[in-house]
């Protein structure tokens, strides 16, 4: 079977590539290959009753399937060049913002209308942060919520399913360069195309690395972010979340001058497990619907680690720390902040007596046995710094779940069109190492679709 264009990965980059290609040229013969399930079949078996922890499904419904890892996220689209990737370095700052706004318009068209667009513009919290050695990054944030985000994806799939051929539960094994075009091989068949877009996300990092080796595409080591997910009463951060929803706050530690940042803030949200390459880490979700909201807010505190020669395996470093947590706790570990600073392990009794009711069934433990001292010291410093702008953050009963790890793909060598050294082979989204967010990944998909159509004219 031969197609004009094959897209590998049905995450945000792949979806928006397919959408824009159809808009630009409805006559194109397009196929999308996805290792995971269709959206309606993506169900995590963890129910909190019979199954309380990850059972390592062959295809993780949280990380893979139509919508990618973002399908069950809280649907935050950050419209900014300040964080979320370096797409602007390839296509220019103005065009990057314009594409993110275009993605926002599409999300509104397909079910997101009525959701709020938050902005840091003119906020007094910027000054408050500066007065306490913190930096609030500028951004506009569209919060869809996990529930509305799911509806948008349903509607996008309904729009595309009769115009694009989808192959679900069909992992691609290899990508072979022909002259011209490409051949992709799956377990039972091979397919050819004139042009290929690879958009495999962070969960496809190991696969992407192998493909780059096979095709002699240059890469360079990126980074890994390691930290914890903080859970506390929603009222403590309500003055920030009511106005900004998500605040990206950065602190530079006193001793090591490491940057510690807040990430993925979920007002009235829940803490969840996440499975990456068989390793269980922690994440957070939130919902737009009031009936699904909790009394807690959660967010990540992350320390970015960049490595120099000779070490190149930043993701392997993060995985080893996450595996240690899994070994000690059988999955995710939870600890009271008060216990952490006193050097003692948390137990179920002290957590149950605290004022924060956990939203994830995790194993009480001691994070100091898991996280490197430099990272843990930075997190503790950051919590005390946040306590100055949100009093109560450093309460003894504040819960810390570990570990949270954000893996980044090796950064693939691409030109200004996001095209590799092989003509017609484009690599986009988080799988490229260029983007690290829903908005940037989606925008990269739109951009490449337009580049392909323009180049084929």
Regions found by a protein language model. Give the residues of each.
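Dinucleotide-binding Rossmann-like beta1-alpha1 core, especially the glycine-rich loop
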Residues: 65-115
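Residues forming the flavin
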Residues: 1-81, 121-123, 127-457
């Amino acid at each position: 079977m031969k197609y004009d264009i094959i897209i590998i990965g049905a995450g945000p980059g792949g979806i928006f590539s397919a959408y824009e290609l159809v808009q630009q040229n409805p006559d194109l013969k397009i196929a999308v290959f996805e290792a995971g399930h269709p959206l309606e079949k993506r169900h995590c078996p963890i129910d909190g009753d019979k199954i309380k922890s990850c059972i390592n499904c062959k295809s993780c419904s949280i990380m893979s399937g139509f919508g990618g890892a973002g399908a069950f996220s809280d649907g935050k689209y950050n419209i900014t060049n300040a964080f979320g990737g370096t797409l602007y370095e390839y296509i220019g700052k103005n065009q990057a913002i314009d594409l993110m706004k275009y993605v926002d318009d599409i999300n509104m068209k397909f079910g997101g209308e009525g959701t709020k667009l938050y902005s840091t513009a003119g906020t007094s919290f910027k000054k408050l942060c500066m007065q306490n050695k913190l930096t609030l990054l500028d951004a506009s944030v569209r919060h869809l919520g996990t529930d509305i985000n799911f509806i948008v994806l349903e509607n996008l799939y309904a729009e595309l399913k009769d115009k694009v051929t989808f192959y679900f539960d069909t992992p691609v094994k290899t990508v072979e360069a022909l002259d011209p075009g490409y051949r992709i091989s799956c377990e039972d068949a091979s397919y050819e195309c004139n042009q290929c877009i690879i958009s495999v996300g962070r969960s496809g990092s190991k696969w992407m690395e192998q493909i780059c080796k096979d095709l002699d595409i240059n890469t360079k080591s990126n980074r890994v972010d390691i930290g914890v997910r903080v859970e506390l009463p929603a009222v403590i951060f309500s003055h920030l979340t009511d106005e900004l929803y998500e605040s990206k706050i950065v602190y530079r530690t006193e001793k090591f001058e490491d940057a510690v940042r807040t990430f993925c803030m979920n007002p009235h949200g829940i803490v969840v497990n996440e499975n990456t390459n068989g390793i269980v880490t922690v994440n957070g979700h939130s919902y737009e619907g009031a009936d699904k909201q909790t009394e807690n807010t959660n967010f990540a505190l992350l320390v970015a680690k960049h490595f120099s020669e000779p070490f190149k395996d930043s993701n392997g470093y993060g995985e080893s720390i996450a595996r240690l947590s899994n070994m000690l706790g059988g999955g995710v570990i939870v600890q009271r902040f008060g216990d952490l600073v006193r050097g003692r392990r948390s137990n179920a009794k002290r957590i149950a007596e605290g004022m924060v009711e956990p939203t994830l069934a995790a194993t009480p433990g001691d994070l100091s046995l898991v996280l490197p001292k430099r990272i843990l010291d930075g997190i503790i410093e950051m919590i005390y710094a946040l306590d100055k702008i949100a009093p109560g953050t450093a309460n003894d009963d504040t819960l810390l779940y570990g570990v949270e790890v954000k893996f980044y793909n090796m950064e693939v060598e691409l030109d200004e069109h996001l095209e590799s050294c092989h003509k017609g082979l484009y690599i986009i989204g988080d799988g490229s190492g260029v983007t690290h967010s829903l908005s940037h990944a989606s925008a990269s998909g739109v951009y490449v679709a337009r580049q392909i159509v323009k180049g084929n004219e």
